[in-house]
């Protein structure tokens, strides 16, 4: 982001307000498809995979925020969708959004936002800002594509940029067990493994920003987000994982 932004993207921004409290709104209802899928997945994850959720009390009950989590595979979104008591608009890569003919209508019905990683995507960022200013939750995996070895990898700066542009907090989240559940599995059928997700305290970065945002600032905020995720995973992020890089998710 940054170079790919245009006036239509920035026009989404409303006058700056202080903190999530100014965005308070009634908790939004789950879209019907989202609710049915979430209920079914919840029974499976809690019963078969013994899903444990820690820190859910740290999640804002209303108002917009960005949920930033580590990323192993498709199960991560399912785990977060079950654990978070509000609907999440996830950023997804186009190839995931259109993986099969059934994927696009499914993703549209649950509110997913396709975003390109290899180039600036101001249209996607505009949609993200619209979702946030509607008081909703956006889910971003700062690492971008799936981790290939289950370890935390370097974060992209998209979550930091969106947080600064929208003036909303970032809630870090750490997901455990999904990599082991799908490692080496055919047909995407997970093996039985305990799953866990931990939520950290919301990180606030101040009021919405309209002007240019320095790359060094985006990278510093990305390092903080990745460090918080690493702390929840109880691992050291290392210089590669903590460093920021350009990208929308």
Give the residues covered by each predicted segment:
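Conserved beta-strand scaffold positions in the cores of enzyme catalytic domains, especially
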Residues: 53, 90, 112-114, 170, ...
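Short, basic, glycine/proline-bearing loop/turn elements
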Residues: 40-42, 109-115, 142-146
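A transmembrane-helix-recognition feature enriched in membrane-embedded lipid enzymes
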Residues: 6, 10-61, 99-110
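Non-catalytic C-terminal accessory region of glycerolipid acyltransferases
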Residues: 2-33, 123-249
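Catalytic core of membrane glycerolipid acyltransferases/transacylases, capturing the structured
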Residues: 46, 60-119, 127
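A generic local structural motif
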Residues: 51-56, 75-77, 125-127, 183-185
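A secondary-structure boundary/capping signal
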Residues: 55, 70, 92-93, 141-142, ...
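Residue-level "edge-of-site" marker
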Residues: 57, 120, 176
């Amino acid at each position: 982001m940054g170079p790919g932004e245009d006036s239509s993207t920035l026009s989404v921004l409303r006058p700056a307000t202080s903190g999530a409290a100014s965005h308070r709104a009634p908790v939004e209802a789950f879209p019907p498809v989202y609710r049915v899928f979430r209920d079914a997945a919840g029974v499976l994850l809690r019963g078969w995979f013994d899903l444990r959720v820690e820190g859910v009390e740290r999640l804002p009950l209303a108002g917009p925020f960005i949920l930033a989590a580590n990323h192993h595979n498709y199960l991560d979104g399912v785990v977060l969708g079950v654990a978070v008591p509000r609907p999440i608009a996830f950023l997804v890569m186009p190839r995931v959004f259109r993986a099969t003919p059934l994927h696009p209508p499914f993703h549209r019905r649950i509110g997913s936002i396709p975003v390109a990683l290899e180039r600036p995507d101001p249209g996607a960022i505009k949609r993200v800002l619209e979702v946030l200013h509607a008081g909703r939750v956006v889910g971003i995996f700062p690492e971008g594509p799936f981790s290939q070895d289950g370890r935390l990898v370097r974060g992209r700066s998209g979550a930091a940029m969106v947080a600064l542009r929208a003036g909303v907090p970032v809630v870090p989240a750490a997901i455990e067990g999904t990599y082991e559940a799908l490692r080496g599995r055919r047909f995407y059928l997970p093996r039985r493994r305990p799953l866990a997700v931990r939520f950290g305290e919301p990180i606030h970065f101040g009021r919405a920003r309209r002007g240019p945002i320095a790359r060094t600032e985006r990278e510093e905020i990305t390092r903080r987000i990745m460090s918080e995720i690493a702390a929840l995973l109880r691992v050291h992020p290392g210089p590669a994982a903590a460093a920021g890089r350009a990208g929308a998710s």
